[in-house]
Amino acid sequence: MRPPAFWFTPPDSPALAARLLAPLGQAYAAATARRLRAPGHRAGVPVICIGNLNAGGTGKTPTAIALMQRLAARGIEAHVVSRGYGGRLEGPVEVDARRHRAADVGDEPLLLAAFGRAWVARDRAAGVRAAEAAGAQAILLDDGFQNPSVVKDLSLIVVDAAVGFGNGRCLPAGPLREPVEAGLARADLLLSIGGPEAQRRFATDWPALPVPRLTGRLATLQMGMDWQGARVLAFAGIGRPEKFFASLRAEGAELLRAEALDDHQPLGEALMKRLEIEAMALGAQLVTTEKDAVRLPPSFRQKVLTLPVRLEFDDATALDAALDRLGLAARS
């Protein structure tokens, strides 16, 4: 399901639907606050939570990849622990791309496993214990900011600068899992992802936030593919597929058709065959995201191109300082 438009009206002028649903949003926020009072497991290694306040995609996966690579460059073996949304395995189990599929462990953990060791566990505390026992020197929690089962040593909140915190209301009246003020009071860093205009708008709409702010953008990873003038049929089942389509256009591709799928939507044979027939009729190449690509049926993996993106920080000084404080300085 796509999020309703009224979630993203200005906070000072909420839509009628948001006002009508406000009591339910307040109840949701109260339930979250009660849940967060529960005690959590404290690991023997630093735990870094990559979370968000909004429901849906904000850029956590590229942020996790960037942190894995940053810690690896410091000589730190970081393991990712994910709940494995969309997968059938309860875990804790280490993701193995040679034997696991997205239907087993979820698409995000399968993608993250290409960059380091990743675990899936419905019980996050059990996943953290398993990762620590397997030699993790640091643990990245993929999501879980609103889950108290694991004590976090550093919480990094990720927000899409283009949409900010929406109308500032909690589910179902808005996109938030908890109020902005309450969430940021527990956070250590805020990362807003987007281009210059989106960053300026975010800073205007959400000024004076009580947490150090990092900024960054998603940049296309150059793989030798010349997209200029390429005729493509693009499809994406991510939080905001329009960002992927915009990236293709920015690379110069001729986007003949854009199919926005639901986040984590299964890519079955029937759907892929339909898209293949449409692409052939248009004389277009099928293109998708890295995260969607791990859900492709085996028969389509050689037929679909991907446009990989990576997070680039504008200034990571505050992040590096936070990692140093956790004892994760570069090791020889």
From Swiss-Prot:
Binding residues for ATP, per the UniProt record?
A: N54, A55, G56, G57, T58, G59, K60, T61
What pathway does the annotation place this protein in? Glycolipid biosynthesis; lipid IV(A) biosynthesis; lipid IV(A) from (3R)-3-hydroxytetradecanoyl-[acyl-carrier-protein] and UDP-N-acetyl-alpha-D-glucosamine: step 6/6
Q: Which InterPro entries match?
A: LpxK, P-loop_NTPase
| Recorded family membership | Belongs to the LpxK family.
**Name of this protein:** Tetraacyldisaccharide 4'-kinase
Catalytic class of the enzyme: transferase
Could you tell me the superkingdom of the organism this chain comes from?
Bacteria
Q: Per the UniProt record, which EC number(s) apply here?
A: 2.7.1.130
Under catalytic activity, the entry for this protein gives: a lipid A disaccharide + ATP = a lipid IVA + ADP + H(+)
Q: Which organism is it from?
A: Cereibacter sphaeroides (strain ATCC 17023 / DSM 158 / JCM 6121 / CCUG 31486 / LMG 2827 / NBRC 12203 / NCIMB 8253 / ATH 2.4.1.) (Rhodobacter sphaeroides)
- In the UniProt record, the gene name given for this protein reads lpxK
Where is the organism placed in the taxonomic lineage, from the top? Bacteria, Pseudomonadati, Pseudomonadota, Alphaproteobacteria, Rhodobacterales
Q: Which UniProt keywords apply?
A: ATP-binding, Kinase, Lipid A biosynthesis, Lipid biosynthesis, Lipid metabolism, Nucleotide-binding, Transferase
